[in-house]
Structures are given as C-alpha cells and as structure tokens.
Amino acid sequence: VSEYITGLDFVEWQIHVANGKALPLKQSEIKFRGHAVEVRLYAEDPEKNFMPAPGTIKHLKWPNENENCRIDSGIENGDVVSPHYDPMIAKGIGCGETREIAIAALIKALNEIEIIGIGQNLGFLLNMLNAKPFVDGIVDTAYVDSLGVEDFALPKEMKYQALAIAAKHIIAAGDYINTNSALPLMDPYSPWSECDGWRLGENQNKSVRLV
C-alpha cells in the first residue's frame, strides 16, 4: 500500500539498490498523503482456525477497479487452489483521503466479489473492516486472538442473499424444464400442460439441498 500513500515504487528502489545505485530520496524527503488499507483473500476457513481450504473455484467474479480500489490476483474461474502452496487468492487495496474512505472503498469491492467452490476468509475480512476498533485504528496484533468464532463467519445478510439467489435459480431452472417438457395442450391452465409433479388431492413437496 506504500505506493498509494507516497506515489513511490519501493520495489523498484530495491532493484536499484541491488544494482549498486543509491536511494533516490531520503526518509525525510518522502511525503505521505491519504490512507490505504490492504487485505488478503485466502482459501482458508476462519471458523476452523484458518485451516487451508483447497479446491476448485467453480465461479469467480472480481469487482470493477477504480481510483479508490484495486484487486491483485492471478487466479481465474476454474483454477485449482493447491494444498501444497500458499493459498492466497488475491490482495485487495482500498485508498482515499481518510481512513474511513479507504475502508469503505475496500468494503464495497469485497461485497462485489463472487466466489464459489472453496472455503475462504471473505466474511472474516468484511467483519474486520466493519469492526469499530479497526475503523478507529485502535487494534493491535493480538486483536484477532480476542475474537470469537462468530466474528469469523460471513455476515448473515450475505448468507441469506446467497440462499435467495440459489433458490431463485433453482426455481427458474425448474420452470424452464417444466415448460419445455409439458404436453402441447390448448388449455394453458390445465394441470396436464405442466410437468411440475402436480397430483390431484396431494400436496406438492420439493426438497432441495443447498451447499
């Protein structure tokens, strides 16, 4: 995040120093502007003591980047996160004139991430960024150890939203199959014009397991 608050590329400086060149600026000459916050999206399960959660990413969509947010990742839809290497999926960076603006930009971007197929710490990151002690900048390296399991889970709103989206998809897919499997009758209101499991005098039940 240093490049956001200084406008300088310190990695480039390291390469110059390794080639025997002097540092371009002294510490006193480096000026800071604004704030920047970085998080790392990992294929880990925070609710299980951050155990690695390798697997195949079945769906992945990154948010659109802008001047206040950037996502760095080499992972694409369909990639496999191996248990043999570091399970980092991406880095997210938010920046702005104030700490609050930087955090808000990062929260917005993380909320737009769509990832299915593997366990990850997205919910934990969102909970951390929304926590008042973090927003106020009064946390230390022992802060995570002080949290409970409930602080590591996805926000309930995201869980409900995911279930609603899945249910809507299943219903829509079922309607499509029913429409294309129905008998070609002239009466669109006839129960025989649909193939949805309707039975005379019986309740229609459908059980769907969402994973």
Question: Could you tell me what each predicted segment is?
Answer:
Residues 2-211:
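Catalytic cores of soluble metabolic enzymes centered on carboxylation/carboxyl-transfer
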